[in-house]
């Protein structure tokens, strides 16, 4: 409450770290850290890993290798002062701490106070809508970017459809993408399965208030653009549910296990680019 009144006037050029990965020792956090450790260019960025356990963080750092070892910072999602301390030292906090509907907002608030950009890999569309409704104006006033849904939910779908739409527009007929179907084949390696954070997120959503979830979804879908309005999103979600035959993939398909996230996100991103209304089905073999 009143968070915009407490935003600190600190320029991001003064920050000690370009990126802090919060929740670095979880499944998703480790993947992000491995990427950062091995993809540094000629001018490596200074970055840090953050979490509750110093021992686990140090073990992670020693396993990474690479030319730019991250620093270790301690913070707890339930300790607001520790979150503010790491936010003040970073240009961007990348949070891999979920479920976000239970653990995400304190770090978002810390980033707003410290004028620090935020990114996450949540698939909790209802939570993203809630955060936008609660903190969107304060973030815009502070020049802070809050970027969600940056992982498997829903980057592959968004990029694939962006490339398809661009190819159609550049083609001889200058066509527009109006109908699309994504078909995913999941290959789970032996001993593999869903990350613990994903399972906790699903369980948290199942135990949440249905009205609260609906309000969050509605807030996310809120747009003056027809493509991102609630009815086209619901139509695409219903179209993803049924068992059907895909002539393009040559197989029967069911709803993708993340269709409830990917469909509204794709509609939102298409609407933001001024695209025509889209009928999109998210399916898997």
Regions inferred by a protein language model and the residue ranges of each:
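Rossmann-fold NAD(P)-binding glycine/threonine-rich loop
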Residues: 122-144
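Conserved glycine-rich Rossmann-like NAD(P)H-binding loop of the short-chain dehydrogenase/reductase
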Residues: 41-56
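C-terminal catalytic/substrate-binding lobe primarily of soluble NAD(P)-dependent oxidoreductases
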Residues: 29, 141, 162, 166-285
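N-terminal Rossmann NAD(P)H-binding glycine-rich loop of SDR-like oxidoreductase domains
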Residues: 17-37
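Conserved Rossmann-fold cofactor-binding substructure of NAD(P)-dependent oxidoreductases
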Residues: 74-92, 96-102
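Short, conserved SAM-binding/catalytic segment
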Residues: 60-67
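Structural motif
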Residues: 18, 91-92, 117
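ADP-ribose/adenylate-binding Rossmann-like module
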Residues: 99, 110-128
